[in-house]
Amino acid sequence: MPGKVNFRESQQISIMEFKELDPILHSQLRLAVMALLISAKEAEFTFLKEKTNATSGNLSVQISKLKEAGYIEIIKQFNNNYPQTICKITLGGIAAFENYVKALQSYITL
């Protein structure tokens, strides 16, 4: 039957076509933070917390992982005597996000 792929051919397609997904970005919360920062370039911790509905502790851990990967910078400062944490996407973070999106698209277009 035309268009039908046998098991062996499907194995070859999956080996050849599926790109590995970045494990740092594959987390739902880290991906959400990166998606927000792609459009905003930088955002306050409180904004990210509100938009992602994450707890402070979980968000703090996840942005630390993004920082360790070099995907974001974390700037801690004071604003009117109140502590303020700003997350800023890096060029490496932009590239990683774009590569992640391309990898996902390759799964869809097979």
Language-model segments: residues:
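Glycine-centered, phosphate/nucleic-acid-interacting loop/turn motifs that mediate DNA/RNA or nucleotide
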Residues: 70
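Amphipathic alpha-helical dimerization/coiled-coil segments
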Residues: 2-10, 15-18, 35, 91-110
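N-terminal helix-turn-helix DNA-binding core of bacterial DNA-binding proteins
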Residues: 17-58, 77-80, 84-88
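Short beta-strand "wing" residues that participate in macromolecule-binding interfaces
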Residues: 74
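Short, hydrophobic-biased segments on the C-terminal half of alpha helices
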Residues: 63-64
